[in-house]
Amino acid sequence: MNKQALLFYPLLGVVLLGLFVGGLAYGAVPIPLDHVMDILLGKGSDKIAWQNIVLQSRLPQAITALLAGASLATSGLLLQTLFRNPLAGPSILGISDGANLGVAAIMLYFGGTLGRFTDWPISGYMAVILAAFVGACVILGLIIYFSAKVKNNVMLLIIGIMIGYLASSVISILNYYSSTDRVHAFVMWGLGNFSGVSLEQLPFFGTCALIGLLLAILLIKPLNALLLGEMYAANLGIQIKRTRIVILLCTGILTATTTAFCGPISFVGLAVPHIARLMLGSSNHKILVPVTMLTGSCVALLCNMLMVVPGNNTILPLNAVTPMLGAPVIIYVIVNRKNIQYFN
């Protein structure tokens, strides 16, 4: 294993822990770190309000940010390797737009429930997660199909963008014919946040995210084989079609779960894999996958803290913060593309 990677594991672990605990203390209501630690250790606090803020609000929010960041970053890495394209990602290729369309159909047209169409009523966040998953997987399936037809990566990106425009067009029509309350709910969901997962919903969200992340870890060997090209991967015994389907499923789980609960989050899935590659100087997925997960969690936790305006109760939308960190990385990657190791 790369010796440099061995240094990044503990370093990222310390940064992750610091951002996690810092996020519990920092907010519209500042809470001293010693009180935060007492609350986490079960000792409680003489201020009940602080205890409720930490346990009921900030702790689920921090765990959500940790898992969502890892999920989006891993999803972006899988797509970049699958398409051998450094600009591939859930948002760029229209996958997030597919999830948005599914959620829009549920929230704007069906009113957040599928119960009237099924014997088993599915309502609330269950309907949203199902709709996001189906929407994301449909778009992913289309991208995989077109990737077999179009060999030029730039053309494939354009197709993904066009699919995103089509999804946005349908969403606009649904918005036009929906009630004000439903449109407002959808717009608020679309701003992105990590506070949409309650303590009761956290086990479901965490289980879905961890399943996707575990599946990504199991894909490390096939991903490394794909770096050599599909022909060489097939000669190494990798079943290309099955590997594509598994990557499709894994990316669908990670993207749909995060998008359903947190809204469409930009740049994390696109930028974080590049940050990990720049740190490691390697595209070996044995070290790249875990470092990407850790880096994604750190970036998401940092964004979660930056959303809070100091000295003010205002909370910025998540998608107003992520481009500040992600856009400079992508610009740097484009400018220095020839000097960065991608798929070798």
Q: Residue spans of the language-model regions?
A:
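Alpha-helical transmembrane segments in inner-membrane proteins
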Residues: M1-N344
